[in-house]
Curated annotation (Swiss-Prot):
<dbReference type="InterPro" id="IPR029063">
    <property type="entry name" value="SAM-dependent_MTases_sf"/>
</dbReference>
<keyword id="KW-0238">DNA-binding</keyword>
<dbReference type="GO" id="GO:0005634">
    <property type="term" value="C:nucleus"/>
</dbReference>
<feature type="DNA-binding region" description="H-T-H motif">
    <location>
        <begin position="107"/>
        <end position="126"/>
    </location>
</feature>
<comment type="function">
    <text>Transcription factor that probably regulates the expression of the gene cluster that mediates the biosynthesis of notoamide, a fungal indole alkaloid that belongs to a family of natural products containing a characteristic bicyclo[2.2.2]diazaoctane core.</text>
</comment>
<feature type="region of interest" description="Disordered">
    <location>
        <begin position="300"/>
        <end position="320"/>
    </location>
</feature>
<keyword id="KW-0804">Transcription</keyword>
<dbReference type="InterPro" id="IPR036388">
    <property type="entry name" value="WH-like_DNA-bd_sf"/>
</dbReference>
<dbReference type="InterPro" id="IPR036390">
    <property type="entry name" value="WH_DNA-bd_sf"/>
</dbReference>
<keyword id="KW-0805">Transcription regulation</keyword>
<keyword id="KW-0539">Nucleus</keyword>
<dbReference type="GO" id="GO:0003677">
    <property type="term" value="F:DNA binding"/>
</dbReference>
<protein>
    <recommendedName>
        <fullName>Notoamide biosynthesis cluster transcriptional coactivator notR</fullName>
    </recommendedName>
</protein>
<feature type="domain" description="HTH iclR-type">
    <location>
        <begin position="74"/>
        <end position="145"/>
    </location>
</feature>
Length: 460
């Protein structure tokens, strides 16, 4: 077996020391939290737990990369393939739900109850058990582990695993054939997905027509490939100093729902928010593509802000106004203190074939004059954009995001925007009087840029 070079040994030693220190810190922190009143646990305490957990996982990933070789990589891939197949098999026969939540049962009784051959069941249990999923506390006897029990109490976890086995994996394996046949096509029916299923229907249409598939896709996006939900992004944005704005107006541009606005309105009672819905650049792959019924009640097809129906006076809803506005239309609100601009995460296949980056550049250019006149601020949520290569402390987080990006390509010939492309677009946004500049980057505990703060800067 090839050895590790001297610089590799130094890195290995440093990672092992960091891992040891972080594990001790994590254990000490968790003990402090568990010994205190859980109801009084602060958000900072939970954030610190997440941070130390991420550091531990990053160190483990780095150590594996330093020690691993071709054999270790192939063995790990072979194991993961079979784990995915086993999860699909367990879901097909609803075996997890048959195992008592407390205690366990004999494998033979479980096989009889599920109607499967006991020899197959035993093999599956013993493989997934190597990953802490189910256990055999005594020969031929099975019980849940804390990990496997969660797949019974939360159907969404199992939905994600089933989608991975039934669609994500087969589709990914058809990528070479799709490239041979379709080249660089962006048409939504010329994809690896269409070849894998031998179907002419776009994936985006399939998840709209089949609710179960749509549910599984949403679960896969959020649990397996790290798509940040709007509530989580809103939690991150809440770290900004919104209370300093007083009774100012905030305009959310290019929104797909009102969830972020309501979150901010609930948390900051002096804010007034105008939500500008833009479905023209929405992707059908977005789980929020179908409009919630409560949002439709307040949606109008003109550009005059309309409050949502029958809000209680003084409530958060009374301070949230919903309008419809596409990116190509002039911004009617030119005196807001803050504009939250949602850039199109996906390079959607629009009828006109418009490029997402050109849309972003045009919209950024439009805000030059507005920000110059008002000294306002432009916020761009970026949690779901692809991070700069190598910029995150945990490489697994970047791997998860890039897995999601390839899923979009293989399923629908779509793709996510790179942070580097957005930085380039901002850098070139200027006119004869000034330019847009980034004044702050709000980052998560792993170094992910979740929001950019921009303002207009006049030339000296």
């Amino acid at each position: 077996m090839p050895g590790i070079a001297m610089d590799g040994l130094s890195k290995l030693e440093a990672e092992s020391e960091r891992l040891t220190a972080t594990i001790k810190s994590y254990v000490r922190h968790r003990r402090d939290v568990e010994s205190s009143d859980q109801l009084r646990a602060s958000p900072d305490a939970n954030m610190e737990a997440s941070r130390t957990k991420s550091v531990i996982l990053a160190s483990i990933a780095n150590i594996k990369a330093l020690l691993g070789g071709p054999v270790e990589l192939l063995q790990d891939l072979a194991r993961q393939v079979e784990i995915v197949a086993c999860l699909r098999w367990l879901a097909e026969y609803q075996i997890l739900a048959c195992i008592p939540a407390e205690g366990g049962m004999s494998i033979q009784d479980l096989a009889d109850l599920a109607g499967v051959p006991d020899i197959q069941l035993r093999r599956v249990i013993r493989l997934v058990g190597t990953s802490g999923f189910l256990q055999e506390p005594m020969p031929n006897y099975v019980s849940h582990t804390p990990l496997s029990a969660q797949f019974v109490t939360n159907q969404s976890w199992l939905d994600a695993a089933v989608f991975m086995a039934e669609l994500a994996a087969p589709t990914a394996l058809h990528m070479p054939a799709a490239t041979h046949r379709f080249g660089g096509s962006r048409h939504p029916t010329e994809t690896a997905y269409n070849l894998a299923l031998n179907s002419l229907q776009p994936f985006g249409a399939a998840i709209q027509e089949r609710p179960k598939l749509g549910r599984q896709w949403s679960a896969y996006l959020h649990h397996a490939v790290g798509l940040h939900q709007e509530k989580k992004i809103a939690d991150m944005l809440s770290q900004l100093k919104w209370s300093s704005l007083g009774n100012s107006f905030v305009v959310e541009v290019g929104a797909q729902s009102t969830s972020m606005a309501h979150h901010l309105a609930n948390k900051f009672p002096t804010l007034h928010l105008i939500v500008q819905i833009d479905r023209s650049r929405a992707s059908r792959l977005n789980p929020d593509y179908l409009w919630p019924g409560e949002m439709m009640n307040g949606l109008t097809r003109d550009f005059t802000p309309q409050p949502e129906s029958s809000p209680r006076p003084g409530s958060a809803s009374s301070r949230v106004t919903v309008t419809y506005r596409s990116a190509s239309m002039p911004q009617p609100v030119v005196d807001a203190a803050v504009y939250i601009l949602h850039v199109p995460v996906l390079s959607t296949n629009s009828p006109a074939g418009a490029d997402a980056m050109e849309t972003v550049k045009t919209e950024l250019q439009d805000y030059l004059g507005i920000l110059r006149a008002t000294a306002g601020i432009l916020l761009i949520p970026t949690a779901n954009l692809l991070p700069e290569p190598g910029s995150l402390s945990d490489p697994n987080f970047e791997a998860v995001a890039r897995t999601r990006d390839l899923n979009y390509l293989q399923l629908a010939n779509e793709g996510e925007m790179e942070m580097t492309d957005l930085f380039s677009a901002i850098e070139t946004t200027r006119d004869g009087l000034g330019r847009l500049v980034i004044t702050n980057q709000l980052r998560s505990h792993i170094g992910l840029t979740v929001c950019l703060t921009l303002k207009h800067e006049t030339y000296c």
